[in-house]
Amino acid sequence: MTLRPMSERKPPRTKLCGSRRTALTLFGLIASLIACHAASSLRVTAFSRDGVLAWTNAPVPGICTIQAASAPNGPWTPRQNTFATNSTGALTVPMAGGNCFHRMQAVAVPPTPQGFTNLVYAYGILETIAGSGFGRLDDVSYWSPYFEGVPATWAALSRPHIAMADRAGNVYIADKNGHSVLRVAPDGTIHTHAGTHVGGFNGEGPAPATTLQLNYPNGLWTRSDGIVYVLDTDNGRVRRVNTNGIMTTLFLATSDGSAINVGRGLWVRADEALAYFCAGTKLRSWTPAGGLKTLASGFSELGDLYVEPGGDVIVGDRGANYAYRIHPNGSQTILAGNGTTNGGGDGFSALATGLYGVRSPWPVPTGGYLLLTHDGCQLWYLDTAGIIHLLLNGSELTHNGDGAFFYNPYVPKISEGRAVTMDYEGNLLICESDYGYIRRIRFQRIPPPE
């Protein structure tokens, strides 16, 4: 199912219900809250002096949007989105000085064509947040000391493989050929977070992370508090960088610390009692008591992974063109892909669709999944009914679309996809291109034309 480009249609809007209105004064700030969805049941239950807004009867799964205006008749500007995974919820609304009116709207995101439309138009601008695209050669580091502290889009990345954010808004990048983990701060500047930019091994730590060498780091996992775990592939280790910038070795990822065979993807539980990573044809697990084990094997070329709350592991097998669900007992089922590079497509069954080099899965709070393909250069959304939808198209060596609405499946905008994640605000982070870019799709509606 293909949607028309933004220029040809207006974003879907929910009906406003005047009966769902609450007005209160907070230190001279007048807030008008209008809330409803198709069932006319969404209701704001509280709006505190510090800007915490609470509601009930939201559609599930759904997306709630706060809009703001300087007058009760608008014009209204989308201010903030949040996914509704429960019928009740709350968020903090940024409070501005003077009179400001707010209203709340919600749309449902069921596994239907309209649900996909509602999801698409909750997102907005595509942008590059890191990478200048200077070079694309493998086994070459393009890092320069000049890049330290400059805007991240001025820095040349060196085959980055994943970008993941903490709750404070820092984005951490495993810059494989730069032998480092880079951090994009909330102000958009880039900094070395771990590694020396020279591949090798010079100790386990504890030591400042920027004094210890990494060797082709291919994966990372970031906790909400800013602790970062690194798959130090050619050093055969998983490293831990704490919030004070001190790096240690959490565990050896091979029996003797030799290089991991095609190491990709990493997940570490918050209590550090369980970890998973991919090693070529195997999904490996680690526990402090049991050490390393193979949970599942027989794959072609595993990529990234995500572990669900129930314990299932979602992985992409780039070589086999399948995404799998692997259960805690090691059994597996195909989640998406037909095992070839073509067939099916937008609006078809995910199991009938060729996902060329599917590499990276990530869950969406709707219950669906994002699936990013390396060779196909595409970002897909898999809904809970098993139907797949094309979110972002691409082609080899393409870098296009910055500053505009992200959705137009007819226009290539990305190239070789390596990882997709979602930050704590709902923005999508896409690590793509041999030239090395980190792209972001903002979870922010585009204001409708006045």
Residues covered by each model-derived region:
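Short loop/turn segments immediately following the C-termini of beta-strands
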Residues: 176, 233-234, 278-280, 318, ...
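A short loop-to-beta-strand structural motif that recurs across blades of beta-propeller domains
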Residues: 65, 179-183, 236-240, 281-284, ...
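Residue-level detector of Asp-centered blade-edge/turn motifs that repeat once per structural unit
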Residues: 165-168, 222-225, 268-272, 307-310, ...
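Gly/Pro-rich loop segments of beta-rich domains
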Residues: 115-159, 189-216, 245-265, 289-303, ...
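Blade-level signature of beta-propeller repeat domains, shared across WD40, Kelch, NHL, RCC1
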Residues: 416-450
